[in-house]
């Protein structure tokens, strides 16, 4: 619950690489260049979400940058936060942000930091602060939640470049980090675009548009309850029960699995079926006796699994022969290979139209449940076996292409996330302004030097009787 190091020790450790400074710079305590105001303990009985009174910033609002809490009680002086004010959460992760919403009151466990801009550049301060907060957080012990004291903030030794250099660094960081954020935002949109692409591929696959060479092929209309789809006229129509191996009928699995048995038989549950696949890495295990009672629901290679309780419509395919059973919330479909290609059935069940049908066909009991009777009667389009194989080939080819792009995007995102840290570290080592310093020696020397700035700050403090920057508290 307490901070375990001094600011000097943090700087020596420099665990996040953001506490370095250029050898021409100095350091100064935060309370020498900023005023810290602790939040007030406003009565929670006066809080409301009806917009009665004035907005109030609670610690949960720091990262959001806005609040839905209002305070209707008496307002003491000195606890207002205005747009562009810097606030810090004093519990948990010690987050800092620039407040961009309407004026609001400062509640307890949030502090406001007002930079004395004749001594320190506000934007430079904002870029520097998170690295120190992160280091403080890493060196703060806790039983439940970590707490940050304003005394720790006051004593934090910040980098002190010349004022002109602070301004240049802040401007460079504003530009570079905005570019990083823009790049990151564009990259983060791509997985959603790829998701829509995959859905479009599935929709095209199950309506013949992926394989028909003549794009003006003749279609016929099929009605699925409230939905209508067009499929090629030369495709057959059937129901799910007609394409299931009669020796292994549609079924659900183990109703009461009992305890997790170390040397038992593995069991596939809803949580093990995601993104079209069955994850076999973390299966729970049931006793061999219970498994024997449910021999009917054992799985084999190429079985299709559908979740039918809770999260309706997750589809998975068993890729290998394994000694595994399924849970009550999972249905097993064993395709008749002479009629349907297992992966084509997987594609059909995963398609947007069937996913909608599965969800809307489920009934709300204690939890959403899809009855096996309804599932048996689900419509299935039937191209020729040859065309099914070709559909599967093309879908897998396009999905592999999308997967490759997604992997590249994830790698790029990882590099972009590291880029912010790298840029900040370079900035505070003075590397972003090396050329600027060489071109502007007069702005970093003499009366414009970091040493002169430090002496000026000390002199002003001495003239005011050694009084430190105010720290309001109640």
Swiss-Prot record:
Under SUPFAM superfamilies, the record lists:
DNA methylase specificity domain
Q: Which GO terms describe its molecular function?
A: DNA binding
InterPro entries linked: Restrct_endonuc_typeI_TRD, Restrct_endonuc_typeI_TRD_sf, Type-I_RE_S_subunit
Q: Which UniProt keywords apply?
A: DNA-binding, Restriction system
Entry-linked CDD domains: RMtype1_S_EcoBI-TRD1-CR1_like (cd17257), RMtype1_S_EcoJA65PI-TRD1-CR1_like (cd17256)
Extract the coiled-coil ranges from the record. none
Task: Give the top-rank taxon of the lineage listed in the UniProt record for this protein.
Answer: Bacteria
The GO biological-process annotations, alphabetized, read as: DNA restriction-modification system
List the Pfam families hit by this protein, alphabetically. Methylase_S
Task: Summarize subunit and interaction data from the UniProt record for this chain.
Answer: The type I restriction/modification system is composed of three polypeptides R, M and S. The restriction enzyme has stoichiometry R(2)M(2)S(1) while the methyltransferase is M(2)S(1).
Q: Which family does it belong to?
A: Belongs to the type-I restriction system S methylase family.
Domain comment, in the record's words? Contains two DNA recognition domains, each specifying recognition of one of the two defined components of the target sequence.
Q: What does this protein do?
A: The specificity (S) subunit of a type I restriction enzyme; this subunit dictates DNA sequence specificity. In the presence of the R subunit the complex can also act as an endonuclease, binding to the same target sequence but cutting the DNA some distance from this site. Whether the DNA is cut or modified depends on the methylation state of the target sequence. When the target site is unmodified, the DNA is cut.
Q: What name is this protein filed under?
A: Type I restriction enzyme EcoBI specificity subunit
